Amino acid sequence: MASTLPTTWPHESVKFEDVSLTFTKEEWAQLDLQQKCLYREIMMENYNNMISVEHHFSKPNVISQLEEAEDCWPMEREIRQDILPECSGPSLDPGMNSFPAESPLMKIKVVEVLTLNKDVAGPRNALIQSLYPESRENLNPGNLKPAKPSKRLTDTEALRQKFRHFQYEESAGPQKAVSRLRKLCHQWLQPNIRSKKQIIELLVFEQFLSALPEKFRVWLESQHPEDCRAAVALLENMTSVTKDDAQLVCSSEATDQLKEKRKDVATLPVTVPPEEPVTFQDVAVGFSQEEWRLLGPVQRTEYHDVMLETLGNLVSVGWEPTLENRAISPDSPIPVVKPIHDPNPKDLSRNGIQSTVFEIISQDRVQEIHTIESNQAGLLQEKSHPQKKLSESSKSQEGTNLHKSQGSLDEVPPRKHVKVKQKGTRKGKDRKNTISMTRGLRIRNQQKDSVEWQGRGDSNPMTHGYSIKNQRGSEQGTAGARRDPITLTVSAQFYQKATGSEEGRFRDNSNAIVPDTPTKIHQKSPEWHKVGRSNNSMSSVQNDQMGSGAGRGRDNTILTHALPVKIHQKGYEEGKVQGNRNSLRHVKAHQKGSKGERVRELSTSEKHVPYIKNHLKTSEREKGRENNDSIKYGPYIKTCYRGSEVRKLRRANNCTKAISRHAQQIFFIKIHKGSQVCRCSECGKMFRNSRYFSVHKKIHTGERPYMCMACGKAFVQSSSLTQHLRIHSGERPFECSECGRTFNDRSAISQHLRTHTGAKPYHCQHCGKAFRQSSHLTRHERTHTGERPYVCSNCGKAFTQSSHLIGHQKTHRIKFKKQPKL
């Protein structure tokens, strides 16, 4: 026997010859049928293991012969073929019948299995050692024990191979062939032992293996899974499957195009002050394209939160970022780490990248996030409006640019621009607000009571759109006040710049995240004061803009989540703001039918944000300042004008808790000690929102302030009255796109759509049964708890449903009518 076993593991890649066994004709003739079958299994397993570790080479001739042959060496006919049914070795040269007196096998004490799988090699070696007695030095046919069928001989895979590889030539006629095939099928499936479900599982498992790619199938067969569940678990846990899937997503052509585009992208310099001990690059973590594809949604979300928290911590200790790194959501495309020139090169990742700029890689383009250098004199101009250049001599200027974020809907048309230009402030300074809006935005001009549409052609889809200019009066009230708001629905990404003193220069908070919250912004005060940046960059963004003119500051704030905004522009009356509606938390942007839009403003009594109130109430005088001089952008953004309030808000927001990215599910998670929580004195329910508590109190007091003028019915909430009025008017604005049915309530069409989709979102915690409506779930849970809330006042009998009680009460009325008259 000529063996090619290496004494030491070579430095180059392993070849099939390094783990294979070869025999000469004389050596082959000395082997019996069982030894030949064992040799075939070992060679096939070694070949499969080499393929499983991604060794690409041509198939050896020995493996081809072993795969093509059906019977195991026909010259050994005296040994029964059913002993080793899975043996299908090659028909070697029939001249190998000689049995020389001396053989190299005589010098081998114990034959070891050469395989890369140690779990398989151990049992095989034990089997070989049991066949060959260790007390004898020579191995000859007389020393071998009688061949006994091992456990593997009766394995399901072996029986399946016999059934699948059955040849018609093995039987004398068709009748015997059918009977033989039926017998093999019974031996494989064993219908007298297995159930129908188990038999079906075997057939599904066989088809699953045949449907797999050859590379995965060969590796899976080498692991010998028992059923489909084990096979699926092996495939899911295999790391190479994930890598192959990641490579399949990016084709070779797309990779070449990506490399060319990445070369064209200009690198951006990072200006880091030499005295700064820590930079963002020191604590940032970068991922390559292949590494990002391997991350799951949960891992991407964690990376997103960690990077935002890291940036917030750096900003809180006084670090001034020079790059506007846009936050990457988990559903965003793959970010690629781009090398840039850094005066202080440091290794940030295992790929040796010195400093990074995040890129958003889409299907056909590479779009790099532009940066804004804070040490330059002017704002970075947008390429879409070259004719609207910002004047360097302007002392006071504010630019607001709202862009569509990654988390918004995909079906939104291209964006539009609406410019609101304000003039005539206290010192004659110009104010500009550039708002990026969606297509089809309707703007109602309150002075002319008409809808104006002004298009502005531009090749850039981010900047072309509508423009409307409104002239505002001076401080003495030269212009009339606008009573009705301009209702907008915008996406949020703000670039703000304000002027102020050099001592209180506002530092940039480039990654403040604002959830999808309806917001009402009141622009009232002609004076812009300046607020220092809060230490908690994750929970709130405070913008303070002062008009002292002693220096220039800049505020560049990016809000990367969709933010519906309603902007109310109100006039002045001798420099004072009319009304105290500036403390509203939010107002929804109503989009209704062709009859127009109706905006219902919330009152200020019980609809303030209860989460910041505790920090701002220290005295009645400061409370008055807050009501007159502050502008609240929802529960997370606040722009105020007093230095004392700024310092107080800094202390209040000095916690490290971060706002949840899904704020529509968790309304507000930052609860400080001493925060006011509303508790109902009647039923004990607790509310963290005073607005919900005020609605709840009306249930106990019986107050129904909203009354229908047609029928006189009263309601607790205005939305209930609006829904009721549709009954009188016959309006059914909600139409099902599937069947065309119309409804007068949004909740009704939501329940109806579940009949088409089959969705059952309400699950019982006791038995797991699902329901389409929450009322059905509540009714079902009473069968588990035994609750019977509906009690008959006549006999005291209780029921689980109100309809059952109504039907029961009818029986009392019938009995009362049947009583004879006295």
UniProtKB/Swiss-Prot annotation:
GO biological process: chromatin remodeling; extrinsic apoptotic signaling pathway; neuron apoptotic process; regulation of JNK cascade; regulation of transcription by RNA polymerase II; retinal cell apoptotic process
Cellular component, GO, one term: nucleolus
Subcellular location(s) per record: Cytoplasm; Nucleus, Nucleolus
Top-level taxon of origin: Eukaryota
Gene3D superfamilies recorded: 6.10.140.140, Classic Zinc Finger, DNA breaking-rejoining enzymes
Compositionally biased residues, Basic and acidic residues: 382-392
Primary location group: cytoplasm
Alphabetized Pfam families for the sequence: KRAB, SCAN, zf-C2H2
Compositionally skewed regions (Polar residues) per UniProt: 399-408, 468-477, 533-546
Any GO molecular function: DNA-binding transcription factor activity, RNA polymerase II-specific
PROSITE patterns tied to this protein: KRAB, SCAN_BOX, ZINC_FINGER_C2H2_1, ZINC_FINGER_C2H2_2
Segments for region (Disordered): 376-481, 499-550
Domain SCAN box, residue spans: 160-242
Keywords: Apoptosis, Cytoplasm, DNA-binding, Isopeptide bond, Metal-binding, Nucleus, Repeat, Repressor, Transcription, Transcription regulation, Ubl conjugation, Zinc, Zinc-finger
Compositionally biased spans, kind Basic residues: 415-430
Chain ranges of zinc fingers (C2H2-type): 678-700, 706-728, 734-756, 762-784, 790-812
All copies of domain KRAB, residue ranges: 14-85, 278-358
Sites of the Glycyl lysine isopeptide (Lys-Gly) (interchain with G-Cter in ubiquitin) crosslink: 15
Subunit structure: Interacts with NGFR/p75(NTR).
Function: Transcription regulator which may participate in NGFR/p75(NTR)-mediated apoptosis. Probably acts as a transcription repressor: specifically binds to the 3'-end of zinc-finger coding genes and recruiting chromatin-modifying proteins such as SETDB1 and TRIM28/KAP1, leading to transcription repression.
Family: Belongs to the krueppel C2H2-type zinc-finger protein family.
Name of the protein described by the UniProt record: Neurotrophin receptor-interacting factor 1
